[in-house]
UniProtKB/Swiss-Prot annotation:
Cysteines paired by S-S bonds: none
Zinc finger (C2H2-type) stretch: 179-201, 207-229, 235-257, 263-285, 291-313, 319-341, 347-369, 375-397, 403-425, 431-453, 459-481, 487-509, 515-537, 543-565, 571-593, 599-621, 627-649, 655-677
Record's protein name: Zinc finger protein 569
Subcellular localization(s) per the UniProt record: Nucleus
Family of this protein: Belongs to the krueppel C2H2-type zinc-finger protein family.
């Protein structure tokens, strides 16, 4: 390991002066020197092993003058024009001033050097080590680059040819860079530049914001930071009015409006509005991930991603929301969160006008219009519009489920499903309906629920025009037209159009019923079935008919009931043309044409076309009568028989003749009565 790669020592970050140099510093510069030296020393003893206090630190603490040293001066070739002289001329008459070699015949060019290095020169308070070359005719800037070659001049004569051989020239000029960093070897022409540079090694941040306490190593960065507090924003976008502290930020922002993407990837041709985004993108092709976390070994292609990741280990969340107090590890995350409070959506789709709070969300949305799906699965070729969707899809091939619930050990391939699942254990339902007060675990469930109240059905079937309140219902419905049943049971060969129905069916073979009723102990294969069952205990009927006020425990029952008001009968028999309001009624009716009777009694062998008919028949063998009249105690084997019996007690006669107005308690009695009018 080289010295520049190792630990920083006090020698690396110390700055020394000659007696003459110290005299050239004004009180402000001396004070800055004292502060930086003491700060560098304190930084080193804070993060490193104990140090013996150097003499210079003792003197600075006592506000005495520091030590005086001799200095070796670094030279580099002048970037100006080269003056020609005899290439075999030697430098003679070597002279030493304050440890610096000076020659009287080094070149034909008269230089003027700072009195910092030549006691007989005029004083230069700014301490610039520039010199003026009459041969070139201009003042040369100091050397700040890492790539410039530097030459230490020894205190002895040397061959001019040997010194300048790499440049193939006869008369170079030199620029002084006498202030050298002991840690990395970089040279500087001014003391203050070296002082600023040393903060890179020590982590020193001399400039502190009085508003928030944040420290900065450069004054310019502190000035820019102050503008965040003062909201001093000078550069305004003429398109949207957004303002920026820096002109460069405005220029980048305006590319959102113009669509300009000047930075193009040479590998795939993708273009970007910012050069930094192109650099990050190119790492996808190279696979380069140079930033590694020391805690867990995870690597990142961007330094900022590593910095953000490290806060996961430390738990640091320094950016807090003023509205709700929620804290974030990154200021960008806080900025996006704030738009949730303000409702700001600055990114608008040119096609449909939909607005978004994040630019990335707009890009994803635009792919809905263009149909672009740039992320393709290497296994099956399926393409996706989002990288995250591809990542999740790949888990269906690998079987990976990285999100595990600590409560029940259930694993999930989607983080979103994992978060939703955790709310089952906490019973957290943060999203409440303003109409009926019902609460939901997910916001999306609340949105779907509210469509019951509003009657909104935004998803329309292109084949028959039928509308649905949920997209999943539309997708399931469209399979009726296509006849598609992609999910086939390996046990019995039965196929299903929906994956959920297939999963539920498989539990018939396994006998799995993981959901138990706390009231009666009855078990169910689906949580939805348990939810519906619990309503039989609670009597809850949340779905109410707007026409007659009748309430139902299931939304599907309400939908069926509504057809009694509308007269809708969407299920038509292909054999005889008879229509039905329920699909199950059509299936039972079709068995009348086919003669199919799939439900057979184990006792007597009698077969039935309906499961409910077999259940009632079996009660004839067992004598079971589970439906009791609460008034007289009479029991019945069928609930329909109990319903008819109850009308004797209540006097209810719901079936009315439209001809004469006579009412009946049973529908069959009304049908028989209506024959009087027809004959």
């Amino acid at each position: 390991m080289t010295e520049s790669e190792g630990l920083v020592t006090f020698k690396d970050v110390a700055i020394d002066f000659t007696q003459e140099e110290w005299k050239q510093l004004d009180p402000t510069q001396r004070n800055l020197y004292r502060n930086v030296m003491l700060e560098n020393y304190n930084n080193l003893i804070t993060v490193g092993p104990p140090l013996t206090k150097p003499e210079v630190i003792f003197k600075l603490e006592q506000e005495e003058e520091p030590c005086v040293v001799e200095r070796e001066v670094l030279w580099r070739p002048c970037p100006g024009e080269i003056l020609g002289i005899d290439e075999h001329q030697k430098i003679q008459d070597g002279q030493v001033f304050e440890g610096i070699v000076v020659t009287s015949e080094a070149s034909e060019c008269p230089e003027e050097f700072a009195s910092t290095f030549f006691p007989n020169a005029d004083s230069i308070p700014s301490m610039h080590s520039l010199f003026e070359c009459d041969g070139v005719g201009e003042c040369l800037e100091p050397n700040f680059g890492d790539d410039d070659v530097q030459y230490p001049l020894p205190e002895e004569q040397f061959e001019y040819d040997d010194a300048m051989q790499p440049f193939h020239t006869s008369s170079p000029h030199f620029v002084l860079t006498p202030f050298k960093c002991n840690h990395c070897g970089k040279g500087f022409s001014q003391t203050l530049d070296l002082i600023r540079h040393l903060r890179v090694h020590t982590g020193g941040k001399l400039y502190e914001c009085h508003q928030c306490g944040k420290g900065f190593s450069h004054k310019e960065k502190l000035i820019n930071h102050h503008k965040l507090h003062s909201r001093e924003q000078c550069y305004e976008c003429s398109e949207c009015g957004k303002t920026f502290i820096k002109m460069s930020n405005l220029i980048r922002h305006q590319r959102i409006h113009t669509g300009e993407k000047p930075y193009v990837c040479q590998e795939c041709g993708k273009s970007f509005g910012q050069k930094s985004n192109l650099i990050d993108h190119e790492k996808i092709h190279t696979g380069e991930k140079p930033y590694k976390c020391n805690e867990c070994g995870k690597s990142f292609s961007q330094k900022q991603s590593l910095v953000a990741h490290q806060k996961v280990h430390t738990g640091e969340k320094p950016y807090a929301c003023n509205e709700c107090g929620k804290a974030f590890p990154r200021v960008a995350s806080l900025a996006l969160h704030m738009r949730g409070h303000t409702g700001e959506k600055p990114y608008k789709c040119d096609k449909c006008g939909k607005a978004f709070s994040q630019f990335s969300m707009l890009i994803i949305h635009v792919r809905v219009h263009t149909g672009e799906k740039p992320y393709e699965c290497g296994e099956c070729g399926k393409a996706f519009s989002q990288s995250s969707a591809l990542t999740v899809h790949i888990r269906s091939h690998t079987g990976e489920k990285p999100y595990e619930c600590k409560e029940c050990r259930k694993s999930f391939s989607h983080k979103k499903n994992f978060i939703t699942h955790q709310k089952i254990h906490t019973r957290e339902k943060p999203y409440g309906c303003n109409e009926c007060g019902k609460a939901f675990i997910q916001m999306s469930n609340l949105v779907r629920h509210q469509r019951i109240h509003t009657g909104e059905k935004p998803y329309l079937c292109k084949e028959c025009g039928k509308a649905f309140s949920q997209k999943s219902n539309l997708i399931a419905h469209e399979k009726i037209h296509s006849g598609e049943k992609p999910y086939e049971c390996n046990e019995c060969g039965k196929a299903f159009s929906q994956k959920q129905n297939f999963i539920t069916h498989q539990k018939v073979h396994t006998g799995e019923k993981p959901y138990d009723c706390n009231k009666c102990g009855k078990a169910f294969s689906q949580i939805a079935s348990l939810t519906l069952h619990l309503r039989s205990h609670t009597g809850e009927k949340p779905y109410e008919c707007e026409k007659c006020g009748k309430a139902f425990s299931q939304c599907s029952l309400l939908n069926l009931h509504m057809r009694s008001h509308t007269g809708e009968k969407p299920y038509v028999c292909n054999e005889c043309g008879k229509a039905f309001s329920q699909r199950t009624s059509l299936i039972v009716h079709m068995r009348g044409h086919t003669g199919e009777k799939p439900y057979e009694c184990n006792k007597c062998g009698k077969a039935f076309s309906q499961s409910s008919s077999l259940t009632i028949h079996i009660r004839g063998h067992t004598g079971e009568k589970p439906f009791d009249c609460s008034n007289c105690g009479k029991a019945f084997s069928q609930i329909s028989s109990l319903t008819l019996h109850m009308r004797k007690h209540t006097g209810e006669k719901p079936y009315v003749c439209i001809e004469c107005g006579k009412a009946f308690s049973q529908k069959s009695h009304l049908v028989r009565h209506q024959r009087i009018h027809t004959h």
